[in-house]
Amino acid sequence: MKKITFLSALIAIPMAMSAQSQIYPQHFDLQNVRLLDGPFRKAMVTNDHHLLKYDADRLMTPLIRQAGLNEKEGSRYYGWVEKHPSFPNWGQKDWSLEGHIGGHYLTALALAYAATDDASMKKQLKERLDYCLNIVKDCQDAYAADTKGLRGFVGGQPINQIWTGLYADNLTEFRKYGHWVPFYCEHKILAGLRDAWLYAGSKVARECFKNICDWSVLVVSNLSDSDMQAILGFEHGGMNETLVDAYTIFGDKRYLDAAKKYSHQYMVKGMQGEGTYSKTFLNGKHANTQVPKYIGFQRIAQEDASASDYKAAAHNFWEDVANNRTVCIGGNSVNEHFLSQDNCEKYITAPDGPESCNTNNMLKLSEMLFDSSHDARYADFYEYAMWNHILSTQDPKTGGYVYFTSLQPQAYRIYSQPNEGMWCCVGTGMENHSKYAHFIYTHDGKQTLYVNLFTASTLKDKNFALTQQTNFPYEQATKIIVDKAGAYTIAIRHPRWVTEGYSVTINGEKQSVSVERGRASYVTLNRKWRKGDVIQVSLPMELRMEECPNYTDYVAFEYGPMLLGAQTTAMDKNDEKVTGLPYESLRNEYGDDSRMGHSYGVRGRTLSLSSAPLLLCDRSKVMQRISVSDPDRLQFKIKVDANTGSTEKVYPWTTLTLRPFYEIQHARYMCYWYQRPQEVFAQSDMTRADREARAINDRTVDFVATGEQQSEAGHKADYSTDSRYGAYRDEFYRDCQKGGHVEYTLVNTTGKSEDLSLMLRYTTADKGRVATISIDDEPLQVITIPAKAENTDGKGFFNMTLPLPAKMLTEKNGKGVKKEIRVRMTATGDTPMPGCYYVRLLKK
């Protein structure tokens, strides 16, 4: 990293103490809560070191380039881009999210700085943060004299014309580049600057944050309400949330008004109704596009008591996602989208499961809703998702992050590497592991201290101080030592999962508590506390079985708040000797800069469902198969069945070890298990479906999930203005009107021009619709959707395979094989183009 010295590099943080409390008035400043030894502290320390491995110069390059500083002779940044090239992957020329990781990095450094008690690490993190912030300031200053809508701006996407267009009330460029999600990227910069002020006390960050908030107001100031709502149909992160925060910090009502302007009213209105909200409204929607919107809605409701519709929307959204769409790891969605109740088999059959960003944001929303209600259900949800999803997404060896956590039996994780693969979940991953102390304790002022999480830690605040000693969940108890005398209430969570025997003692004296098993609540202890008082809380747990939401063929096992998983392969050769499990070198276990380098479904080696361990018995007898193995390590033995009739090689398991899911890394795992009687399994179509799906997947060279934002953007999607996307019978499609077109670029990695074909997925519901399929502007075939088709599935979908002539895959000079082909579908008949549900390039 190039050394640049700035006068403002050493700024103390006293003002941040009150700044955090401005935004989070019921939370303790992060630097006042310290993690003690345990899984969370270990993850935090690992992450601190991992953050410093990132090349800050390259993370800042997009901002420098867009500000024009790279080309300014005499500037310290002259020639910067050539020396420090921007990261690829999501900084591709055809789909750039440049700048988003830079924003996350500011947040991550600030959080890590506040959370650590290591003086040397704190110094390094602060120096790195100040270094980046002063670059951001220089970039922002470069726009100071601008009069075309860029004053106060700082950003990394190579599309400044979007912003000048919006300011001029011209949406042409935004419509062209909206799928690059420009406001999503800008939100990360806003949030990073906000957090650098809140958690690290940087006055530079505070000034830059105010300026970019002013820009956020300015750039859309000339848009009509209808045009504003149109652009909010594209992913825009939590723009509304950060603007509410600006209102809280600076007291300028313009920011609160702007937050409402940045609020997608379709999503507000779609989740109204106390207990009567639509349970289908979220079906098919891109999940993490939505969660930050509702965080912003809740922030608006916190600052504006009259915003009851925003409050209802946030509450109902959480209820729907937490109660109807959350799976065994505490996450939600498949391949980034919410499923319908009729399509929940995809939790198991789809290889790319819950996205880490979703859970990161659901935890934020849970905190906010808890602050407004002190409802213990939010804390229960937080605990479960934190242990089973967030903690499990860190590679304990390298500190790398995980994008999708597959729920498929025998899946494995794909980890990021520093300075490679700038995925969105790398950004939130950077932040996650410095926030474990954020919600352990909260308060309502000076009267009540809430103990929300059972995490070994200390709290030292002007009003409260205590130490929590525990090895939870490996110990079914926690001890709380009061370190500051005073008259106040301590409220301790009674979790939903706790069994009979929950008890609380103070200095050895048992307290009378009123709790209901299976219902989350708080036990309140009101007294005049003396320094040294000891509270003991007993937290008995039991093993239980939970069904997969709306797909009851599969079950998971939980102990207390912990999901129990099982390895089916060894982590390494030594683990093979210890466990007796076979060792497998996992394909592409570490992601790269390829477009889908984060995807287990694309980059990993998937196995068939029928080759996984099974539980073939009556459901009433499942728990009889499980016995305690090592209670101190939460380990159990489970008797399993191996499907010897599988078309794939099946390891002859008889027993496997259940243990906390987050511990299982660098190996294939089970979290959901097929559980039906032998006779039901024998009549199921699992093996046939496995065989058919595997045959297609093994032949797939490239794949476009049409109608899905990231897949389309990653394949240089180009379509006419009348094109639309949607979902039919739980599958996504894209079509266009008469005369319109849809085009994608597919990559041919085979190096061959022969024996390749195109597979297109359609539905007979579009019978009579006509399209011309072209390759690089050369017609391949005119297709008409029939009323009936061979191999139509039960929902009316079928696959159409079109062989590709070798000449279409050969360069025009005849001397090489094309590495890319443009597949265009044109509505050449008198009807709209038939909806296309995916495009595959297949090898023989």
Can you describe what each PLM-predicted range is?
Residues 1-21:
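Bacterial Sec-dependent N-terminal signal peptides
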Residues 20-119, 123, 127, 161-199, ...:
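Aromatic (Trp/Tyr) and acidic
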Residues 159-180, 206, 212-230:
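Asp-box/WD-like beta-propeller blade repeats and closely related beta-sheet repeat scaffolds
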Residues 213, 218-220, 226, 230-268, ...:
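Solenoidal tandem-repeat scaffolds enriched in leucines and small polar residues
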Residues 314, 380-388, 393, 399-482, ...:
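C-terminal beta-rich recognition modules with glycine/proline-rich loops and embedded aromatic residues
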Residues 487-506, 756-758:
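Beta-strand-rich binding/interaction modules
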Residues 510-532, 538-552, 724-753, 761-843:
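Beta-strand-rich ligand-recognition modules
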